[in-house]
Every structure is written in structure tokens, then in C-alpha cells.
Amino acid sequence: MSLQNDIITALGVKSSIEPAQEIRVSVDFLKNYLNAHPFVTSLVLGISGGQDSTLTGKLCQTAITELRNETGNARYQFIAVRLPYGVQADEADCQDAIAFIQPDRVLTVNIKPAIEASEATLRAIGVELSDFVKGNEKARERMKAQYSIAGMNAGLVVGTDHAAEAVTGFFTKYGDGGTDINPIFRLNKRQGKALLRELGCPSHLYTKAPTADLEEDRPSLPDEVALGVTYEKIDDYLEGKQIEAKDAAIIENWYRKTEHKRRPPITVFDDFWR
């Protein structure tokens, strides 16, 4: 079996999907997990205004609404969390995403004061953060806030990790990669777009260039520039299509380099790294 086939199998990607069916799969997955854990009554998710959090947020709210209606338990809630670093450049998109999702609750946590305090504390002991490392600090601070909110609301922190992100390891370890449950894990980028179209999402929320926007030296850096390969090529690869050798090599290099991100902490029993 080729590495491409191994990756497709590991990430559970289908070569084609039926959007309505996949929406149902994700919603039922969330509902079934909460039904199996009755002490959990909330789903918590950071909303950035991009494709992945918009899709995941809509799936979460749908699942929670159905659970409330089916069980009569009014404690079930979806909490959308806005987590800007100061003022977000695409704040209008965030508000459009919130309007589309219609979450039960919306909380806003400005992470900038916490990041600046951490940066100053480290600087005082001689540790000066690079812009890249500071970007990862932002991702981890966002997750810290979400876990605090979840902890006070009997909740789970929901992740937006999908196959095109997982294959490249394009997430911060113990940042946006540190979640409890990932309902869109098996989908690639174009499949996520198809689900949003099916759900009636405003198109500008999933047609704009994806960006993590963590680095201040390179603001709004497109994911595809950072990765060196387009999502179109990544999606083709994940659907089993043949792509140019140079693009496949980039994807497979990212996959090998970031294997540690897709695993729990390494122990003496692990041998994938040998």
C-alpha cells in the first residue's frame, strides 16, 4: 500500500460525499456522545469567522437544538466563543458567522492582555519570544479560555480539525489541536465547503483565503503560502487522485514531520518515530 493510501485510510477520507448525509453523520455523532455522557450538557467552540469554525459551529448548534427538543433538557447549550487578539481584521466575517450559526450563547474573550502578560513575564527571565512562538501562544491561550468556560458549564471543547489540516499538521500542538471532540475530522477542505453550501451559509465565509493569522510579522498569511501547496492539491491527494510529484512530496513531508502532533505524548512503547 502506498503512503497516500495509508494516509487516506488513517484520516478516513472519502473520495466523494453526499453533503446532507455527512451533516447528519456529524450531528448524530455529537448527539450520541452527549447522550452517552449525561453529565456533559454544553459544547464550547471558538468562532473565528472562517470556514472550519463556521461549519463546526452550525453542526454543534444543530445537535444541541435537537437534543433539547428530544430530551426536554433545557440545560443543553452551545456556547460560541469569540477570541480576538485586540481587534480582529475580519471582525465583520465573525459577526456574519455568528448570525448564520445563531448560537445559544456568545462570549467574547480578548486574549491580548493575557498574551502580553505572559510575554512580559518570560522577558523578565531572559526569554524573548519570537513572532512564530508568540503566535502559538495565542492559539494556546484561546484553548485555555475555552477549557475554562467548558469547565464552568459542564462542557466539551469542540475542535475544527479536518483531514486537510490533519495531513499537514497545520495546527498548534495543545492549541487548536487540543480539543475534546472533532466532528469534521474526516472531511477535506472542499467537502467542508459542500456542507456549508448545503446548510445555506453565506458564501464569503467559505470562499475567502484561509488563514491562521497568528503571526504579527506576516499578518493574514494564507495557509497555502505557509504550507507551500494549495488546498486544491491537498484535497485531490486525500481523495486518491494523482497529483504532481512535487506537490505530493510536500504533503507527505508535512505528514511525516508532524506525526507527533496527531498522537498522544510519546512513550517508550511508541516506535513510529524510529
Curated annotation (Swiss-Prot):
<keyword id="KW-0520">NAD</keyword>
<keyword id="KW-0479">Metal-binding</keyword>
<dbReference type="InterPro" id="IPR003694">
    <property type="entry name" value="NAD_synthase"/>
</dbReference>
<dbReference type="GO" id="GO:0005737">
    <property type="term" value="C:cytoplasm"/>
</dbReference>
<keyword id="KW-0547">Nucleotide-binding</keyword>
<dbReference type="InterPro" id="IPR022310">
    <property type="entry name" value="NAD/GMP_synthase"/>
</dbReference>
<feature type="binding site">
    <location>
        <position position="160"/>
    </location>
    <ligand>
        <name>ATP</name>
    </ligand>
</feature>
<feature type="binding site">
    <location>
        <position position="52"/>
    </location>
    <ligand>
        <name>Mg(2+)</name>
    </ligand>
</feature>
<comment type="pathway">
    <text>Cofactor biosynthesis; NAD(+) biosynthesis; NAD(+) from deamido-NAD(+) (ammonia route): step 1/1.</text>
</comment>
<feature type="binding site">
    <location>
        <begin position="260"/>
        <end position="261"/>
    </location>
    <ligand>
        <name>deamido-NAD(+)</name>
    </ligand>
</feature>
<dbReference type="GO" id="GO:0046872">
    <property type="term" value="F:metal ion binding"/>
</dbReference>
<dbReference type="GO" id="GO:0008795">
    <property type="term" value="F:NAD+ synthase activity"/>
</dbReference>
<feature type="binding site">
    <location>
        <position position="165"/>
    </location>
    <ligand>
        <name>Mg(2+)</name>
    </ligand>
</feature>
<dbReference type="GO" id="GO:0005524">
    <property type="term" value="F:ATP binding"/>
</dbReference>
<feature type="binding site">
    <location>
        <position position="180"/>
    </location>
    <ligand>
        <name>deamido-NAD(+)</name>
    </ligand>
</feature>
<dbReference type="InterPro" id="IPR022926">
    <property type="entry name" value="NH(3)-dep_NAD(+)_synth"/>
</dbReference>
<feature type="binding site">
    <location>
        <begin position="46"/>
        <end position="53"/>
    </location>
    <ligand>
        <name>ATP</name>
    </ligand>
</feature>
<dbReference type="InterPro" id="IPR014729">
    <property type="entry name" value="Rossmann-like_a/b/a_fold"/>
</dbReference>
<comment type="similarity">
    <text>Belongs to the NAD synthetase family.</text>
</comment>
<comment type="function">
    <text>Catalyzes the ATP-dependent amidation of deamido-NAD to form NAD. Uses ammonia as a nitrogen source.</text>
</comment>
<feature type="binding site">
    <location>
        <position position="189"/>
    </location>
    <ligand>
        <name>ATP</name>
    </ligand>
</feature>
<feature type="binding site">
    <location>
        <position position="211"/>
    </location>
    <ligand>
        <name>ATP</name>
    </ligand>
</feature>
<protein>
    <recommendedName>
        <fullName>NH(3)-dependent NAD(+) synthetase</fullName>
        <ecNumber>6.3.1.5</ecNumber>
    </recommendedName>
</protein>
<dbReference type="GO" id="GO:0004359">
    <property type="term" value="F:glutaminase activity"/>
</dbReference>
<feature type="binding site">
    <location>
        <position position="173"/>
    </location>
    <ligand>
        <name>deamido-NAD(+)</name>
    </ligand>
</feature>
<keyword id="KW-0067">ATP-binding</keyword>
<keyword id="KW-0460">Magnesium</keyword>
<feature type="binding site">
    <location>
        <position position="140"/>
    </location>
    <ligand>
        <name>deamido-NAD(+)</name>
    </ligand>
</feature>
<dbReference type="GO" id="GO:0009435">
    <property type="term" value="P:NAD biosynthetic process"/>
</dbReference>
<comment type="subunit">
    <text>Homodimer.</text>
</comment>
<keyword id="KW-0436">Ligase</keyword>
<dbReference type="GO" id="GO:0003952">
    <property type="term" value="F:NAD+ synthase (glutamine-hydrolyzing) activity"/>
</dbReference>
<dbReference type="Pfam" id="PF02540">
    <property type="entry name" value="NAD_synthase"/>
</dbReference>
